[in-house]
Amino acid sequence: MTDSDEDALKVDQGPSRDIPKPWVIPAPKGILQHIFGTSHVFQSICDVKPKVTGLTVPLKVREYYSRGQQCLEQADWETAVLLFSRALHLDPQLVDFYALRAEAYLQLCDFSSAAQNLRRAYSLQQDNCKHLERLTFVLYLQGQCLFEQCAFLDALNVFSHAAELQPEKPCFRYRCMACLLALKQHQACLTLITNELKQDTTNADVYIFRARLYNFLQKPHLCYRDLHSALLLNPKHPQARMLLQKMVAQAQQARQDAGILAVQGKLQHALQRINRAIENNPLDPSLFLFRGTMYRRLQEFDGAVEDFLKVLDMVTEDQEDMVRQAQRQLLLTYNDFAVHCYRQGAYQEGVLLLNKALRDEQQEKGLYINRGDCFFQLGNLAFAEADYQQALALSPQDEGANTRMGLLQEKMGFCEQRRKQFQKAENHFSTAIRHNPQKAQYYLYRAKSRQLLQNIFGARQDVATVLLLNPKQPKLSLLMTNLFPGMSVEEVLSTQIAHLARLQLEQMVEGSLQAGSPQGIVGMLKRHELERQKALALQHSWKQGEPLIATSEELKATPEIPQVKPGSSEGEAEAPEEEEEKEKEKKEEKKSELIPSKVASLSDSYLDQTSSASSMSFRTTGTSETEMSAICQEYRSTSATAVTFSDSSLLKTQSSDSGNNREALSHGPRKIKATQGQRQSLSKTEPTQSQRRNSSKTKATIHKRNSSKTKATQSQRRNSSKTRATQGQGQSSSKTEATQGQRQSSSEIEATQGPRQEPSKTKTTRSPRQRPRKVKAARGRSWRPSKVDATQGRSRGLLRSSTKTEAFYDSNWSLSKTEYAQGQGQRSSKAEGAQGKSQGMSSTSSKAESTWGPSPSLSKTEVDQDLTYYEAV
């Protein structure tokens, strides 16, 4: 625009401008009338004449309006602004010209001038909403331009002003949020978003916006909540899906970090990481399962139970593996919680927790064991026993359950002892031994109970077992003094009672090891290794001079009874030649068969009897009551000490004759020294008797008999002492016995038998395995007729086929004592009949002998051996 145009505009604007008039002192009223008087010529001077402008201004305004519209159409924005400005100078109340000039300023990107003109227009016409909408639009454009120019604070002010003008439009608030985020004023932005969501809860974008803000602020649980709300409003929202995948990836990463920390033992850090994973993905049940496990390991049981229950609520039907894992962890949590209560002394709470666990799982042995421990501490021994039994039913070889059952049975046995119920106490101690056979104190307690029950043999065997397990066991010396008077530990361990105790103990331990051995190749290798070790131990025992045990094949091949080796104190020494033959046979049998079947059967029968009975017997047929009474009567005549124990054991068990013989051995009489002198006086007579009996017919008869007892006497002939030699040659034919019977009167026999009822020092240490049946005949002087001897010969044949193992043990247990009985007790049938008449047998004794004679359990040699044993005692 040129200067001439401006001057013309100024000239045109002159008439419409209000020119201020100078202030003058107003003339007083009536001054003109006072001056001019009554003349009316100058009276019209005071009247103000109106200006005539109505025609000029509207014409100019119309001109500027038309010219400004043309400029807008021609995009001449500056000229339009000038024309509209001139028109507004002519008439400032023209609202439309403000709006038109604002459009021209808007096209010139002068948002401030445009907004100012629109405000002026809106202020003049507030009822016109178009001006307000246009104003807010201009402000939006202005704020957006400032935002793009990174003038975030100015943009925030502009958007805030627009939001104030039109609060119903959220777009201005959204732009304010963007400006606050750009200014890193997150809390202010979060507050603004929260206020926005209070007004409008149907916009998924707002939830996603706040979810992103929460994720940025490391508040994943709030982020996931807003994301979940956004997906509910719009399940296919792409931004929501992208954010969800991002959160799942963050959760998996946190889960891996937690696993690494848990393996390293940093449980607290692992718990923090798994918490972060759950916050990122709270719908994954595996994360709660992991966190519950961490809680359980940190002994935060309430949180663990809550997480596991939440897992069970979250899993679906197709997630069976997850359900099993959650249930398993829940059971372990209950169990660990119960253990924690147990350590704190809250046993009742522990029982309640384990009850919850056992309602869902009945196949877990640990739960029963722990509940049994709680019951044990509460004093409910019956419930504790039931739980331990259930645990053993699930796992019979569980070491912890067997140990606990042993302790429980021990305590129950003590309770029964206090109530004077010694039989029940013995049963409890036997149960404890069955569950823990290597615990020495259980055998000691059972020995005391058996001693009170007058089961002396069982008590001795338990004491021998204690010596094998723990010779330094407290309170053992008193029982040894009572049960093994005058014997040292080595002497007790060298007896056959100790040998049987060792066999039983080895069998029980071996049974437990075999039952607990693993299956498959590993178990087979372990069994082979155990067998090899047994073979080496057996070979070592032969080298050390322990008693040799014949196998079933040797017993069948030779009816003779093997002797005990020189290392043992129970039997006589063998000749060197036979000893070498025995060792060769043993080595050959060891290669083919590591464990003899006969010995195993013996130990089996022994185990069965000792578990419930008080005396052991390897015989199938026991003695009758008449035989027992006769034995006891003859034994009373020998020693008062032996009477007490023998009678008590017989009254208690009425068992086999071998058990009674053992009881009699340990409680020997005190008259040994007194009778040794008398025995020495008779030693000269014995060689002559034995030499006369040593004829060819004797050997023939011995081989015809083929009894195991006869070989025992043959082996004994090789002994060095004259007494043993004569005793070993004691078996002769019937003619030799008749000759001896004619040469010796009945009085001489009685005199010889009387002083020989007490053994020498060598015989006192020998085995107690004696047979009491024929003792009655020898001591009662009721010698049997020839028919009875024939019947006994037949019975020996039956005995060899059925009880070969019994004969084996009989020979090992009573050899030296048999020699004396064989040396003096062989008589012919005629001599026996004459002696029976001369001695005046009673009808009772003859009936007892006739009943006892055809018994298939004993041969004549066995009876003589038993007689020698009781004489020794």
UniProtKB/Swiss-Prot annotation:
State if Lyase is listed as a keyword.
no
| Comp. bias regions, Acidic residues | 571-582
InterPro entries (alphabetical): TPR-like_helical_dom_sf (IPR011990), TPR_rpt (IPR019734)
Segments of this protein annotated with the region Disordered: 1-20, 553-626, 639-873
Q: Start-end of the TPR repeats?
A: 61-94, 96-128, 136-169, 251-284, 285-318, 331-364, 365-398, 406-439
Q: Where is the composition biased (Polar residues)?
A: 600-626, 639-663, 675-693, 709-750, 800-828, 836-860
Q: Which residues form the signal peptide?
A: none
- PROSITE patterns, per this entry? TPR, TPR_REGION
Compositional bias per record (Basic residues), positions renumbered to this chain:
694-708, 763-784
Does the keyword section mention Cytoplasm?
no
Q: Which UniProt keywords apply?
A: Repeat, TPR repeat
Q: What is this protein called?
A: Tetratricopeptide repeat protein 16
Native source organism of the sequence: Homo sapiens
